[in-house]
Amino acid sequence: MNITTLTNSISTSSFSPNNTNGSSTETVNSDIKTTTSSHPVSSLTMLNDTLHNIRTTNQALKKELSQKTLTKTSLEEIALHSSQISMDVNKSAQLLNILSKTEYPINKDARELLHSAPKEAELDGYEMISHRELWAKIANSINDINEQYLKVYEHAVSSYTQMYQEFSAVLSSLAGWISPGGNDGNSVKLQVKSLKDALTTLKKNYEDKPLYPATNTVSEQEANKWLTELGGTIGTVSAKNGGYVVSINMTPIYNMLNRLDNLGGNGEVVLDNAKYQAWNAGFSAEDETMKNNLQTLVQKYSNANSIFDNLVKVLSSTISSCTDTDKLFLHF
């Protein structure tokens, strides 16, 4: 992939948002600024090292996502890795931003070579661009790819997993709400009220919790786009505060509550074995739906992680090539 193609793929990627957050490059660490201003090739080396760190952390994140069951500890590790990636992405954007705005003197041989070169050169039919322009294009995109792509999945996975963990706690309590209905072994006693109360609390806690965006609202078109990206059955698009959000699809919990209502009691209900098995089969089916939703979402996050990792790999290779070229042109 040549540099122009790489730049175009970054700036026109479907994962790059229309809205940008410039705050990440406005406040620049003084050490980074000093290093970049004084030693451009050293700063490119620092940039490449930072991209390497991003890939290392990204691999650790992918390992956490590969677990069959996400625990509270897993979520904490995922959040920690995501935070580290964000810091390193921010650092990379700062370095790129300064490189794109700083002028450096070139040596005598390089100046003579450039004087003999055409003012506008083309490669493979593409107009060539300067390294400064390349740094600016990447700096404008790399933060947003993290914030508006990877972190969308992180928030969605975290929110849905938290909901399912609370549901798992209800499942653990369910064993204590079921007992034999008589001495003949032909019936089961179910504490319907206890189960309904627990499921109702879960519903209230999560029916308005957004999967996307984490804060504020977006257009209906944007919400529908991300519902498709996250998995159509995992959420629902709903209006909120003049905009739209993708909320957790609580239909499985609603169905569980409806089936409890159909048992014909709101306290302790005795069911014959056939009726209990029918109820339990429906309950388990809704549980399986939520498990599948979570599994699909985690897999999509893992895929997004791989796409981001490949992008960083290409950027790192490109920057290494640019560093070698710049060594021929710059004074140190």
Swiss-Prot record:
Please give the GO cellular component terms listed in this UniProt entry.
Answer: extracellular region
Task: Cite the record's Low complexity compositional bias ranges.
Answer: 1-25
Q: Which UniProt keywords apply?
A: Coiled coil, Plasmid, Secreted, Virulence
Keyword flag Secreted: yes
Region named IpaB binding:
192-267
What this chain does, per the entry, is described as: Required for bacterial invasion of host cells. Controls IpaB and IpaC secretion, and the efficiency with which they are physically inserted into target cell membranes. These proteins are exported via T3SS to form a pore in the host membrane that allows the translocation of the other effectors into the host cytoplasm. Along with IpaB, is essential for both blocking secretion through the Mxi/Spa translocon in the absence of a secretion-inducing signal, and for controlling the level of secretion in the presence of this signal.
Which family does the record claim for this protein? Belongs to the invasin protein D family.
What protein name is recorded for this chain?
Invasin IpaD
What species is given as this protein's source?
Shigella dysenteriae
